Amino acid sequence: MTVPSDLDISRATALRPLEDIAAQLGLGPHLLEPYGHNVAKISLDAIEELSDRPQARYVVVSAITPTPLGEGKTTTTVGLGQALRHLGKVSAVAVRQPSMGPTFGIKGGAAGGGYSQVVPMEALNLHLTGDMHAVTAAHNLLSAMLDNHLHKGNRLGVDPHRITWRRVLDVNDRDLRNIVTGMGGRADGTPRQTGFDITAASEVMAVLALSTSLRDMRRRLGRIVVGYTRDGSPVTAEDLRAAGAMTAIMREAIKPNLMQTTENTPVLVHAGPFGNIAHGNSSVVADRIAGRCADYLVTEAGFGADMGAERFFNIKCRTSGMRPDAAVLVATVRALKAHSGRYKVVAGRPLPPEMLAENPDDVLAGAENLRKQIDNIRLHGVSPVVAVNAFPTDHGSEHDAIRRVAEEEGARVAVSNHYSEGGKGALELAEVVVEAAEEPNRFRLLYPDSADLRTKIETIATRVYGADGVSYQPAAARALADYEAIGFGSLPVCIAKTHLSLSSDPSLLGAPTGWTLPVREVRASIGAGFIYAICGEMRTMPGLGSHPAAERIDIDEHGQIVGLS
């Protein structure tokens, strides 16, 4: 079966009025703030209005360790949400807003795909309601206020050598990673080395995703630490008197965006922290609203279960107080074959032809990664469901191999064809998810707030990643000691590492053993509410490839966007 392009499917979808989409969730028109015809903001008044409704079954979609191509988590999230409606359930989907950086880079857009996508996909991938721009503006206002403070006398005694706050932009631009500002003489500022990160890596984005209300966002923005004084005291956005103006910029951005799928299932799109260099989950407020509107809320966590799902459990759920009922692990034939170590998958290039040949033994050779990621879900007391995301090049024997591994591990499993068939292609998956979500589970956090920061890092490294231990660069060790002394030790930990391996080395596939996690730097995201450990060579500002997706994107003679994928 040949499936049209995602853009063609998106444009062929019969969109329903957003009032009808909202009505599926019991949201009245008074709670909607339309942005054009196909997107609306949802008022935060909905949180209070819906507080007496029962809580939805809460399902998180994660994956095995992916290839650079991605394994279809967003597509599976949307397909599952649609399939639950086929079973007569009221369902809602919650996903992150895509960053325009990867949209114009190698990865392309992030609306799902085929007959399981968020539509219109052009709106989702390009600007949407401007939340990304609000985050960028609020972040850079704080940068400007900080530099202005230095220029106007430095009343707070900020140490220019201990400034941790950079600037952000929603573009992949490697030339901005390291820059010098303030050149040109005294009238043009104070020269210092700094740089740009991508907006999705901004702490302001993480604050947006983890805030529970407008007032909570105001408090969190005020707590952002931008650097330290000469005596080692933290300097905050509140100290710089920037937090109020930042909140004013973000006042509309805190409201989730309502869209729909190709089958008119409601979707809440909100916030977009990256899954490898941030905590990688959509917003708490979107889940708080959708969780009171539906029988089932299906949300997505970035990259593999060791990344986005671990942070979903230990950062997002710790903050929101919501408790998941089931977790879906997306597995693909190609990813498991890649984990066999017999093939190399490169972003932007076709798969090796020999990788497409029927070979269930190669699938089984990479199955240790699936086994470990099932275990990572179980560590948190949640029932795992393996979703085999089917591709046209797969073979039945290869699906059977994945099913056999999942069943050996005691996990439910279903083969899903939601890309080519929409919700009806994910009915088996929806049925086993309902079974898993309706059985009792004992959700638990991986570590208590009271554990020290080293213990938290080492718990994640050894129990989730499979490391033998952790090594710390001297600067990282000093930072941990300083953060404990300042009073930041009770915060959870977000570990930034490659998403292409359970380890910090992207070349180590499967479920590697006999390795040590190297922590080279530790930062404090106090506004967001976590400590941020950086392992290996992580880039907080991506670059463009040799042939970025931007080269293919244009408008036609009718003003329609072409080339977006």
Curated annotation (Swiss-Prot):
Per the UniProt record, one Pfam family is FTHFS
Alphabetical keyword list = ATP-binding, Ligase, Nucleotide-binding, One-carbon metabolism
Tell me the Gene Ontology biological-process terms attached to this UniProt entry. tetrahydrofolate interconversion
Q: Which reaction does it catalyse?
A: (6S)-5,6,7,8-tetrahydrofolate + formate + ATP = (6R)-10-formyltetrahydrofolate + ADP + phosphate
**PROSITE patterns associated with the record:** FTHFS_1, FTHFS_2
Q: Which InterPro entries match?
A: Formate_THF_ligase, Formate_THF_ligase_CS, P-loop_NTPase
Q: Does the keyword Ligase apply?
A: yes
Pathway note: One-carbon metabolism; tetrahydrofolate interconversion
Please name the GO terms that the record assigns under molecular function.
ATP binding; formate-tetrahydrofolate ligase activity
Its Enzyme Commission number(s) read: 6.3.4.3
**Which residues are involved in binding ATP?**
67-74
The similarity annotation says: Belongs to the formate--tetrahydrofolate ligase family.
| UniProt-recorded name of the protein | Formate--tetrahydrofolate ligase
